[in-house]
A protein has these predicted regions:
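Active-site-adjacent loops and short helices of periplasmic peptidoglycan-processing enzymes
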Residues: 11-159
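Sec-dependent N-terminal signal peptides of Gram-positive bacterial secreted proteins and lipoproteins
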Residues: 1-11
């Protein structure tokens, strides 16, 4: 998982002194040019959904036409009381894969993220989270662990620069 942003020399952004953690690395040499709290474990926020979407797309391998996912009780009701974003999926509803992807990407839908995690996780959200953490291990991300596919905060849900 690699996120990159290119800025022109004159680009203006938030002052690094007001940022909780950052790391600037020379892409050619791997040399850390500047950092602050780069190994501090912080809430991953939407990086969680990037992993969720990436694993769903990896499993589908671009073949999502005609793929329908069935919404489980847990997809919907595990979010009760979280006041999280959703696309109002209903238990038992069959959702086209493409709609689940778009809903999760565009609306940041946590019910959509749960549905996708079940898809790539062998039928359970827990299996999806296990797949996310297996990918973390494969990528060698020492300071990253996911507790859910949705980005809801938790003590065991963190990443670093």
């Amino acid at each position: 998982l690699l996120l990159c942003t290119a800025l022109s020399a004159g680009a203006v952004g938030p002052a690094l002194t007001t940022t909780e953690a950052y790391c600037i690395i020379d892409a050619d040499t791997g040399l850390v040019l500047a950092q602050q709290n780069m190994n501090e474990e912080l809430h991953p926020a939407l990086i969680t959904k990037v992993m969720t979407l990436g694993l769903a797309c990896q499993k589908a391998q671009g073949n999502w036409d005609g793929v329908k996912l069935t919404v489980s009780h847990e997809d919907v009701y595990s979010l009760a009381g979280t006041d999280s974003s959703h696309i109002a999926l209903r238990e038992g509803e069959e959702v086209p894969m493409q709609d689940a992807l778009y809903g999760t990407m565009i609306a940041s839908a946590n019910d959509g993220a749960n549905l996708l995690a079940e898809y790539y996780g062998g039928g359970t959200i827990e299996g999806g989270v296990a797949a996310m953490n297996a990918q973390v291990q494969a990528l060698g991300l020492e300071h990253t662990h996911f507790a859910n596919p949705t980005d809801i905060s938790g003590d065991d849900h963190y990443t670093s620069c």
